[in-house]
């Protein structure tokens, strides 16, 4: 049975989302169990608490502190050692749970997860990976989305290896295609780091470590040109936020046009099935749940403003990852690519100008395509 640790206090509203989402998840997954971590008095006050308390596949672990969405990383990591977020990570470290899910502060989550679980051998920095809907009817996995704003070429190679393992585990594709986000498809375009990363990815493709498609542009994310798009966290976060803004604007335009007069309102009724199908395809809640790749344990980040439906989707992603042995698949991919990763690391500059801490987890709202 797969057991998932839930930071029940994380997110904008905590138990008001995590409790009903947990109930729905347990109902739909008879072979899964949950460990809800949080403040006992707060959880007990929720109207659905009794249903979880009496559930045979749910247990509670007490935590006296909560990491707020505004807490600096230092406070969350060094002062709140009994926070629900940290205790949830401990459940994974101790083998009680196979994965953890939190909707809390992204920076704090990344720091705590990295401190408690440590990074895998061969990986310098964890990356945030999530899915964005594409025109091909599926989803494109994009990483990094904000954990690392400054990356070297070997970091991008590491992201590609981890992203390939993620997509292979969840989608069943043995060799998912990888694209390197750039300002053009030609190999001569882009910064020196991107050019070098392209060379490394091509070498990895030749050696069988990756299925490298080549350079892709921003619009390829939504075309579904490749299964995976790799970029640094700065570029990934900008692309994510731009797509969110565009989706919101289009939705607003459609609503405004159908509300213009009595005729357009009638047209909206006629078009309701089509509009509903469109909404479902682009509904960001369906893609909630970003993987923190590169850790020695499975951790998934839900958006802080997620509702119960969206948080349940994050639980689903964590369950699928654990069920499909994502952690072991990432390890295997890294081990297979170890010679190339070692060479790439030796070629990297001694210092990339920023510390690992200052370049990680800079945006507390980057982890999923939602707002």
UniProtKB/Swiss-Prot annotation:
EC number: 2.3.1.274
Free-text function comment from the UniProt entry: Catalyzes the reversible formation of acyl-phosphate (acyl-PO(4)) from acyl-[acyl-carrier-protein] (acyl-ACP). This enzyme utilizes acyl-ACP as fatty acyl donor, but not acyl-CoA.
Assigned GO CC terms: cytoplasm
Similarity comment text for this entry: Belongs to the PlsX family.
The keyword Chloroplast belongs to this UniProt entry's keyword annotation: no
Quaternary organization: Homodimer. Probably interacts with PlsY.
A Gene Ontology BP annotation from the UniProt entry: fatty acid biosynthetic process
InterPro entries listed in its UniProt record: FA_synthesis, Phospholipid_synth_PlsX-like
Pathway: Lipid metabolism; phospholipid metabolism
Protein's UniProt name: Phosphate acyltransferase
Subcellular location: Cytoplasm
Primary localisation category: cytoplasm
SUPFAM superfamilies: Isocitrate/Isopropylmalate dehydrogenase-like
Catalytic function, reaction form: a fatty acyl-[ACP] + phosphate = an acyl phosphate + holo-[ACP]
UniProt source species: Polaromonas sp. (strain JS666 / ATCC BAA-500)
């Amino acid at each position: 049975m797969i057991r998932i640790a839930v930071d029940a206090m994380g997110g904008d509203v905590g138990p008001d989302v995590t409790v009903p989402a947990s109930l729905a998840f347990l109902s739909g997954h008879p072979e899964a169990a949950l460990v809800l971590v949080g403040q006992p008095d707060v959880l007990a006050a929720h109207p659905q608490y009794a249903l979880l308390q009496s559930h045979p596949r749910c247990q509670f672990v007490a935590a006296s502190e909560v990491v707020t969405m505004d807490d600096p990383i230092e406070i969350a990591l060094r002062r709140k050692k009994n926070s629900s977020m940290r205790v949830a990570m401990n459940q994974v470290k101790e083998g009680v749970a196979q994965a953890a899910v939190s909707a809390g502060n992204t920076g704090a989550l990344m720091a705590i997860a990295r401190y408690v679980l440590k990074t895998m051998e061969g990986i310098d920095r964890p990356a945030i990976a999530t899915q964005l809907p594409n025109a091909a009817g599926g989803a494109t996995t994009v990483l990094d989305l904000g954990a690392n704003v400054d990356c070297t070429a070997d970091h991008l190679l590491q992201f590609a290896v981890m992203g390939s393992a993620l997509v292979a585990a969840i989608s069943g594709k043995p060799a998912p295609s990888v694209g390197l986000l750039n300002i053009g498809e030609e190999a001569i375009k882009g910064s020196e780091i991107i050019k070098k990363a392209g060379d490394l990815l091509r070498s990895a493709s030749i050696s069988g470590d990756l299925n490298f498609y080549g350079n892709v542009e921003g619009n390829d994310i939504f075309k579904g040109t490749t299964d995976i798009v790799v970029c640094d966290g700065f570029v990934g976060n900008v692309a994510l936020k731009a797509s969110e803004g565009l989706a919101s604007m289009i939705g607003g335009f459609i609503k405004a046009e159908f509300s213009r007069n009595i005729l357009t309102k009638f047209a909206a009724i006629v078009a309701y099935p089509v509009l509903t199908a469109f909404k479902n395809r682009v509904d960001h809640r369906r893609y909630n749940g970003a993987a923190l790749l590169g850790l020695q344990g499975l951790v998934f980040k839900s958006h802080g403003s997620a509702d119960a439906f969206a948080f349940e989707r994050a639980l689903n992603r964590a369950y699928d990852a654990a069920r499909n042995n994502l952690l072991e698949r990432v390890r295997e991919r890294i081990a297979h690519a170890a010679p190339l990763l070692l060479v790439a690391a030796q070629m990297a500059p001694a210092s990339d100008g920023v510390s690992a801490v200052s370049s990680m987890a800079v945006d507390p709202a980057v982890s999923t395509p939602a707002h």
